[in-house]
Every structure is written in C-alpha cells, then in structure tokens.
Swiss-Prot record:
GO terms for molecular function: glutamate-5-semialdehyde dehydrogenase activity; NADP binding. Belongs to the gamma-glutamyl phosphate reductase family. GO terms for biological process: L-proline biosynthetic process. It comes from Sulfurihydrogenibium sp. (strain YO3AOP1). The gene is proA. This is Gamma-glutamyl phosphate reductase.
Amino acid sequence: MDSRQYAENIAKKAKNTVRKLSSLTTKTKNDALLRTAELLLERKSQIIEENKKDLELAEKKGYSKALLDRLALDDKRINQMVQVLKDVAALPDPVGEIINMWTRPNGLKVGQMRVPLGVILIIYEARPNVTIEAASLCMKSSNAVILKGGSETINSNRILVDIIKQACRETCFPEEAVQFVDTTDREVVNHLLKLEGLIDVAIPRGGESLIRAVAENSKIPVIKHYKGVCNLYVDDEADMEKALNIAYNAKVQRPSVCNAIENLVVHKKIADKFLPEIAYYFGKAGVEMRCDEYSYNLLINHPKAKDTEIVPAKEEDYYEEFLDLIIAVKVVDSLDEAIDFIEKYGSHHSDAIVTENYTKGMKFIQDVDSAAVYINASTRFTDGNEFGLGAEMGISTDKIHARGPMALKELTIPKFIVFGNGQLRENVGIPKDESEIKIDTNACSL
C-alpha cells in the first residue's frame, strides 16, 4: 500500500464512524475514557519501555535536553495523563446542547444545537501526552480523530493508541474512530491534508515551521496559531509589586511555551523606577534583555543591572518568539503607543496590561486584538486547564469559532434546528385548482 492509499484508508475508516459517534451516550464515552485511564496504569511498564526506545534513538540523533525532556514519559507524567482522562470524563458533554432558541412571529421555533465537527486530523511534535489529550477530547465531543505524532515518539504513541483502542473495544466505543498514522513517511501527511470530504479540520501543534507547512499545503480547514509573541505592558499607573511579579512569572516560570511573554513594553513615566528592578530579578534568572535606546541607556551602567546581559534590540527582535530566557524591551509615551506596538509586533495570542486605572484597563481589553487579553495577570494562564475548560487541543489565534484554548465546546459547531407546525413560506401550499398555481421564476430570489 503506497502513502496515498494508506492516507485514504485511515481517513475512510475514521469517516465511517461519524454517524455512530453522534449517537453515542455520554456514559459510553465516559466509560471509554475511564477505562483508558485504568489501562494506562495497568500497562505503565510497557509504556515506559516503549518510551525508552524513543529516548535512546533521540539521544543518538543528538536531540537537545529540552526536547528529550518533552519526549520522556515517567510515573508522574503517566499519572498526569490518567488525570486528564478523568477530568475530561467529568466535563459536561457538549454534544446535543441547545445554545439558543427563539420563536418567530409565524410560530416557528428556531434554535442552535452543538454537533461534532466530524473527523479531526491532529499533527503534533515531540510530546506523547498530546496523544491522550487529543484523543480524549475528540472522544468526549463525538469526533473521530486521526493522530499524527512526530517520528521521534512513534513507539510511545503506538502503545498509547493501542491502549485507547483496547479501552474502546471493552466499552463498546467504535475503536476505528481513533486512527493513528503508524508510519514516519512524511508523504502520508501531505496526502491527508488533501482529503476534502473525508477530513473536516486539521489542527497542527508544534513549532512555527510545522504549522506553516500544514497551513500552506492543506486543502482542508486548519485551526492554528503560528507563534506566541506575547506582550506585557506596564502602565504608568501600575502597582510596582504586581508589575514586577507578573513580568517575572510571564517570562521566567516557563520560557519555552507559547504563552510566555517575549516583549516587555513600559511607560516612560515608570520606566526609570521599574526597569532597573526587573532587570535585577531577570539577571538573577539568567534573562537577556534586548533593549531599545531609552532602556539600554538606562540599564547598561545601572548597578541594579550589573549581573544582567543588556544588549541593544534590533527591529526583528520585537517580532521574535524566543521561547528562551530572552526578552525585548520597548519604552513608550502612552497607552495608545503601547497598543500600536502590540498590534504591529504581536501575534494576537496573549497580551496583558498592568495598571490600577480601570478606564485604561478596559481600553486595553477593547483595543488589543488577541485571543486572550489580561488586566493585572500573567499571560501564562492562557491554557485550557487554567481557564477551567479542561484539557485543550491547542490554542487558536484564527478569527473563527475557535479562538484561544480549544477545549470540548470548540470541537463542536452549531447546527440550526427548526420546529414547526405546518408553516409555509408566504403561505403557498398545494393549490385548490390549477389556476392558483404561481411559481416564482426569478433564479436569484429566495
């Protein structure tokens, strides 16, 4: 079987389960999720053994320590996957939920009901726990899923999918609703992305190059975010302690993720007080500060910044997703200038303001066009679990129905449902005699 046939085969298997999935009870779905959780614990030693194969191969290829860490599965991470499954099982089932209902003057009752997207292709890198997160969300939302993990985790992903399928068989959940691309042939992905009619949406999770490759080569809709250039603006009316802690948390707590800040924007009236203090703490954490002219001149010889690497910023630094202990600094004269800066250099992911001025905070929320906008809190909270949504499929910056963390509800779409009692458009029904027959021949008329 060549790569094209392979892709079509698994897509058709997934598509063939769509009608069956839509009629599953919540109990059946939860039973499958909870049985998967049990099997993860029962087969933990097998998971770790298969994961070691991936780690050994990755080490031979010279992968970085950071990547090796993302690949690794241990007792703690397996227990976290178990908890994800339990959490998703505990969430309300979105399928079939009526989200709107109204009555028209003619008596028609019109509403919207949540229904599954259909078949979801998720393409991801490095982290095998995504296999469990993605499958669990798709199963609970009655979507079929095609899982395409990275070649570096194929052994880990294979055993995890085998466990999911075992749970499906044991709980009467259609196991072919969970498909796994069990090959490292990259051409399979290219073929999958062309399968309009079989696959309804693709969701890439990984680096910018992967996401761009998927978006540029796909004929099916793609839900994505290219990168997370997140910004923190410290207003001249900011509480200093809040500003310092938020800036430190948003950059240092976990710098390699998409919701960490990359740009620190500071009002000039508070810059002389705030920047030396944050430079001191950034220095202790090993953060390099790439500064505009004003902040560079302020910090380069400042005693508070003596242990901090201070370098001049280049224009391209403000566009960069560093994913590292590096931050670009910009000093501005006004809130409007800060918002303009964020619009130009940000990626519409997550942006925050620190201010004690309510009016300024509300203007920031109104004017900053991002998936998540904060007042007096760290951008690190842009996450399905942190928002109380449960596990997530990823974070979308697209301007579609799914924006921000994509959890259960974002894996459904509304369908109009209409209840009538014999209503007719313009009361035109079967005529009593042929002379009453009237047909509107205007092709453009509705």
